[in-house]
């Protein structure tokens, strides 16, 4: 029969502190967390900058990646071409990516509407991310690519930039429809390179009987490619976002020795044929994990993503997790860090 041990004062005290720590992690002990969607980051000098979906693209700054201050919005008004591309555009610019190149910061962004591929990816450029600098000014360079219903079986949102071993810069993108694509950018990183070179890098099954104007059931989007060792790692979000507690977003990964693929999962299945190894899915406290980016800073690797907090009416929160690697070179994250990383938004 089981043996029962008395609960000592020390054991009770330890259990109480553990419960309090978990409660503080869940509620951030009263501190206001950073609520972001589709987060990407970069660093200028000793300051990190965080970019999020929102009106004009919301920008935050931090010295330690934990305490964040509102910095600016990249757009004071919507891009002049937005309503032409997407008549039902609501003013929220989606899914940015930020990329440094030859002394400039390139901020890519998406114009779209839910469930439609009346979409375009644009880019705006700045010399600095410090709004106090006299050189701070966003200059919109317009549309990089545009998707048109019935013409294109892809959706021009969710851009992410990667430079290959030869210095060639590529853009990955895509959401639902025919999956995730990759193409070469031209020298000034504002348009596809000519002659154009495009690749399909990941997709899920879609019925051939579905009308091309419909998003379909292939729940895949938000590619992000990280170079590590001998491989390019393609992260993607499967499932549905933006549904509070009903969100099914989760992260999968594959890898390739070529930036153009094929990207294979741990079983050897091509991500172009439905492959993808689970990286993180979340738990009862944190759901809808996805739309990640990934970085190497000061010799350490990090996964940046949003997660919906059940204890706060499923409001989206910033998460920055340590990215580890197993013996076979596959990325790993510790789900416990969803509780231990708690951002604070400073006034």
UniProtKB/Swiss-Prot annotation:
Mutagenesis / variant outcome for changing residue 38 to E: Strong decrease of binding affinity
Reaction it catalyzes: Hydrolysis of terminal non-reducing alpha-L-arabinofuranoside residues in alpha-L-arabinosides
EC code(s) of this entry: 3.2.1.55
Residues at which Ca(2+) binds: 291
Binding site for substrate: 35, 90-92, 115-116, 155, 175, 221, 316
One of the record's GO molecular function terms: arabinan endo-1,5-alpha-L-arabinosidase activity
GO cellular-component term (any): extracellular region
Signal peptide extent: 1-31
Pathway: Glycan metabolism; L-arabinan degradation
Keywords, in A-Z order: Calcium, Carbohydrate metabolism, Glycosidase, Hydrolase, Metal-binding, Secreted, Signal
Keyword Zinc: no
Site label Important for catalytic activity, responsible for pKa modulation of the active site Glu and correct orientation of both the proton donor and substrate, positions: 158
Superkingdom of origin: Bacteria
Annotated phenotype, changing residue 316 to L: Very slight decrease in arabinofuranosidase activity
Expression induction or repression: Induced by arabinan and repressed by glucose.
SUPFAM superfamilies: Arabinanase/levansucrase/invertase
Family to which this protein belongs: Belongs to the glycosyl hydrolase 43 family.
Note: The relative activity of the enzyme against the arabino-oligosaccharides increases with the increasing size of the substrate up to arabinohexaose, after which the rate remains constant. The substrate-binding site accommodates six arabinose units, with cleavage occurring between binding sites 3 and 4.
Subunit comment: Homodimer.
General function of this protein: Involved in the degradation of arabinan and is a key enzyme in the complete degradation of the plant cell wall. Catalyzes the cleavage of the terminal alpha-(1->5)-arabinofuranosyl bonds of linear arabinan and carboxymethylarabinan to produce almost exclusively arabinotriose.
Protein name as catalogued: Extracellular exo-alpha-(1->5)-L-arabinofuranosidase ArbA
Organism: Cellvibrio japonicus (strain Ueda107)
